[in-house]
């Protein structure tokens, strides 16, 4: 489900900004040119039950200065104030399309095409470093490290170049 939600939210953003390079930062952010426009959280409280939270900056123009990431919003990127109902409608359509992709077997290629950082050296929040190679069918991040290939299923990853 996280891959479905990620593709749906990213495609929603791209529907308002077709010229942009909106992409997915593993595991749960949608960014436009490195600025975070949306965050996704998917949890499973029990077998076959999923809860998804989606935070999408629509018309926000002011952000706290002490954020660890540089944020943006659809309004800042389009210079238009958007109706939240229109954004919601597009989001529901994009999520439905992403579910169709899952059923057809097209979801993983779609996710991979939106993923930022493939081929780049990245750092996990626990300090491990590696080259981002791929995302597997379960949404795990595939990294090539100095000791071999690992698959990471949770945590955060920095796409910033490591210090020299």
Question: Model segments located where?
Answer:
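Long, positively charged amphipathic alpha-helical accessory segments at protein N-termini or as interdomain linkers
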Residues: 3-21, 32-164
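General beta-strand structural signal in soluble alpha/beta enzymes
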Residues: 22-26
């Amino acid at each position: 489900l996280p891959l479905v939600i990620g593709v749906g939210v990213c495609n929603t953003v791209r529907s308002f900004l077709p010229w942009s390079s909106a992409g997915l930062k593993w595991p749960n952010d949608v960014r436009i040119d490195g600025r975070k426009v949306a965050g996704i959280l998917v949890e499973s409280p029990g077998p076959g039950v999923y809860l998804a939270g989606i935070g999408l900056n629509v018309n926000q123009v002011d952000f706290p200065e002490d954020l660890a990431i540089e944020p943006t919003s659809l309004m800042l990127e389009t210079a238009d104030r958007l109706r939240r109902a229109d954004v919601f409608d597009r989001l529901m359509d994009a999520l439905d399309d992403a579910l169709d992709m899952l059923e057809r077997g097209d979801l993983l290629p779609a996710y991979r095409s939106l993923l930022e950082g493939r081929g780049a050296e990245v750092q996990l929040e626990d300090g491990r470093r590696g080259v981002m190679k791929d995302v597997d069918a379960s949404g795990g991040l595939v990294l090539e490290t100095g000791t071999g290939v690992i698959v990471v299923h949770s945590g955060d990853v920095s796409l910033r170049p490591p210090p020299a």
